[in-house]
């Protein structure tokens, strides 16, 4: 197959009741992965995902659930097509699923790893009320300048996710974000709203989580990448265990350069395939690319994506 595919994986915020259930009900391969992940982590994923469960909003449960469904979707697609990506990329948590797709992490090991990542992040944020907010319609420079000015004034706020032009997520202490939101609107943002997040991702508040995450990564990462992975920290490709060990702990405390990553890779690919529930990244990519973007989130979208890729490759 000559078509160049980039495999994409979403992060936190893409979770939803019932995600992965269609795979579980209709694929023995998916069911086996699901059961093995439940045994290895001690998390009953069917109870977590297929029934109303408040735990799904807690990061130590959200992260393994999202990764599991994304890895499941990816496995079913690649088992049926044999397609290898020219590169893999994820948004925040999604970078770990991208490592699974690149062959550098076993899927169930990765579920365990991000369960730990969530626990470490929750612990790092447990002594103060933290949060995240999104700014829409303001430039990167304007948001960064505001953050810097307000940090000098004593607020703890950082620009942490560069998602798309005019869309930036800010993390910090919750009461500081509540003070900061009206300042962002006054500066010209169309919207500034707090997100339903229990942690403050990709900022210095997570410093204490980096070392223990790195220690676990050393145990689990493999050095046999089948494709490069795009780093959230640098917006550039890496394909060795040593690079991953350097970059992934940094990812906890440094911004996600998602829109920069898209700009860097768009000329190298013919289409994007997003694995996991929903199509969050398709929305972010609308302004960044004119290339086709497919999503694999259930059995119907799996078959539709396979058919569409065959059409593109004629």
Model-derived regions: residue spans:
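Alpha/beta catalytic cores of group-transfer enzymes, especially the acyltransferase/condensing modules
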Residues: 12-14, 103-252
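Glycine-rich phosphate/pyrophosphate-binding beta-alpha loops
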Residues: 62-64, 200, 255, 259
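Short amphipathic alpha-helix with an adjacent loop that forms part of the alpha/beta core around
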Residues: 305-312
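A short, acidic, amphipathic alpha-helical segment used as a generic capping/interface helix at domain edges
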Residues: 253-270
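Non-catalytic positions within long, well-ordered alpha-helices that form the structural scaffold/packing
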Residues: 78-81, 185, 266
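Short, solvent-exposed amphipathic alpha-helical segments in soluble enzyme
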Residues: 24-25, 149-150, 185-187, 286-290, ...
């Amino acid at each position: 197959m000559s078509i160049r595919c980039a495999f994409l994986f979403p992060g936190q915020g893409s979770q939803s009741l019932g995600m992965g259930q269609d795979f579980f009900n209709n694929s023995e391969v998916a069911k086996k992965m699901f059961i093995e992940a439940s045994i290895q982590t001690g998390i009953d994923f069917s109870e977590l995902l297929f029934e109303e469960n408040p735990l799904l909003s807690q990061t130590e449960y959200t992260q393994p659930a999202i990764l599991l469904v994304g890895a499941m979707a990816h496995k079913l697609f690649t088992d049926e097509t044999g397609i290898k990506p020219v590169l893999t990329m994820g948004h925040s948590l999604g970078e770990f699923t991208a490592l699974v797709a690149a062959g550098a992490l076993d899927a169930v090991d990765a579920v365990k790893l991000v369960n730990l990542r969530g626990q470490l992040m929750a612990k790092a944020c447990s002594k103060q009320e933290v949060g995240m907010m999104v700014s829409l319609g303001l430039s990167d420079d304007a948001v960064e300048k505001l953050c810097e000015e307000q940090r000098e004034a004593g607020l703890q706020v950082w620009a942490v996710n560069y998602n798309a032009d005019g869309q930036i997520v800010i993390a910090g202490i919750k009461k500081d974000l509540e003070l900061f939101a009206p300042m962002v609107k006054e500066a010209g943002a169309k919207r500034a709203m707090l997100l339903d997040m229990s942690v403050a991702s990709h900022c210095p508040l997570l410093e204490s989580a980096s070392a223990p995450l790195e220690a676990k990564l050393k145990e689990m990462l493999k050095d046999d990448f089948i494709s490069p992975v795009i780093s959230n920290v640098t917006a550039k490709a890496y394909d060795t265990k040593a690079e991953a060990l350097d970059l992934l702990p940094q990812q906890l405390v440094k911004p996600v350069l998602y829109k920069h990553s898209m700009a860097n890779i768009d000329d190298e690919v013919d289409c994007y395939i997003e694995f996991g529930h929903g199509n969050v990244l398709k929305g972010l990519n609308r302004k960044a690319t004119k290339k086709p973007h497919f999503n694999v989130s259930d059995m119907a979208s799996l078959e539709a994506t396979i058919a569409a890729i065959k059409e593109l490759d004629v």
